[in-house]
Amino acid sequence: MNKQKSFVTGLVCSAWGAALVLASACGSSGSSNRGAGSGDGGGAEPDGYVPPLGVGSSGGTKGDGSTACVNLQCQQSACSGGGATLTGHIYDPAGNNPLYKVVAYVPNEDPEPIADGIDSTSCSCSSLYTGAPIATGITGPDGAFTITNAPVGANIPIVIQIGKWRNYFVIPKVACGTNDLDTLLPAKLTLPKTQNETQFSNIPNIAISTGNADSLECLLRRVGVSASEYTGTPGALPDGGQPGHIHIFAGTPQQASTTPNTKPPGPSSSGPGGLWDTDSDIDRYDIVLLSCEGSETGNPQPANLADYVNKGGRVFASHYHYAFFYDDSTNTDQPEFPNVADWSLASQGGGDAYKNGINAAIQTTLASGAAFPEGQALYTWLDTTVNALTGSLLPITVGRHDAVVSGTNVSTAWAQSSGATPASTQYFSWDMPFNAPLDDAGAPAYCGRVVYSDLHVGAGEQDYGCTSDPNSCVYQGTTPTGCTIGKLHPDEDAIEFILFDLSSCVTPIGSSPQPPPVATPK
């Protein structure tokens, strides 16, 4: 059965008085087999029937008989004195925070399934946005988008997507002029809570290594991902029917703990069949989140992590996971991650904990003085969209001072401590491979990204009943049932922004993100 046909049949057979219709199928098998030019002798199509995308819907032709438009392209020039425009806002799965850098587009055919994990297409942004987009837009720091030259008519599909996060909706009617989806639709446009929320929805395959000192695994629950997506079962490549897209691994000391961190308990992060022990294991995942373990990560495999990022993987590492990037035993950078920061570690004397909470300044320019559009977007988002700043600064509940990033390093600082002694960089990132080839515009064609955070993101949330020092109880928790659900703490707001930015196509530092190009008639 054509997926789009089953969806459109669902529109016909359901009593859809609502202005937003999620992708689902209903109705009889007889009607689902009907289509333009089917020759089944069934007579006229039922009222409201719309041919599935790509079936019997090619339209105008040029004078020489060649095709001038296909499917919804034929409905893009139906307005006199101007076309149709779509506007609206896009939110996280919880529907709480508007999101930056999310692409919105009208597809001209069914979007293709998104494969899990790292493969030959992982470095290609163009491979993500399938369905032949014919009208596109992208959200700004306020989560707002504008799509111009949209097709007019009934049952117009819209895809919202950032990286491998994707959701799919249908607008029952688009008219000439401006169509404000915030008022026309009864529900918000959100990224999906589950893998199968709509017909073409998708959640990245995410691996999380838990830790003794933080609860990074709970962030995804707070931004709206369903508990049903959490599993202690490693993902397959491709997915192969494994349940859930949030895969929990036991970091130190859960590896030796009798208390499971998931039900069923997840495997060890570093042991055989774990998360980073081999390339084939880690390559199953689109994104890897490493939650602080309370001590230096045991048995890190920097070469495997570097291979993963070079091929398009995305990594968020916090605090003691610096062991992947710096060899504390020799006081030298790991050779796979040279000069990403100047490290000054707790083990080198004096400890690394600030006595109290600190403030951080969001970096809106690069160390060179050049523009940093994504840093400016982060500042604007924290300041006016989610109101997370105190004055102009971001409050950090539990910060550490293990690293400083300056213009002499290959990384980009996103948040620097302000007024704290010693100084530190709280968030920074770098793109890989370090020796990336140049693209046609002369810019490095980076593939993957690492974000390092020198703080505990769950410190203000009281996950697993922790009321003070997370070190005292995080390891006793069960994920995701022990996670606190509620409004994000300000420093966790910043992590949400960075997490979804990490999911997206790698935008070269210093440039502004752009929507994908529109498709031309075939």
Over which residues does each language-model region extend?
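Ser/Thr-rich, Pro/Gly/Ala-heavy low-complexity intrinsically disordered linkers and tails
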Residues: 21-81
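Extracellular beta-sheet/turn segments enriched in Thr/Pro/Gly and aliphatic residues
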Residues: 65-80, 170-204
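Short, ordered, surface-exposed loop/turn motifs in non-cytosolic proteins
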Residues: 84-86, 92-124, 152-153
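A short, solvent-exposed beta-strand micro-motif common in secreted/extracellular proteins
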Residues: 104-106, 133-134, 143, 153-172
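Short, acidic Ser/Thr/Gly-rich low-complexity loop/linker segments typical of extracellular
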Residues: 108-148
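Helical hinge/lid and interdomain linker segments adjacent to catalytic or ligand-binding clefts
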Residues: 213-332
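A glycine-centered loop/beta-turn motif at secondary-structure junctions
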Residues: 310-318, 400-508
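An acidic, glycine-rich "communication" segment
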Residues: 317, 321-428
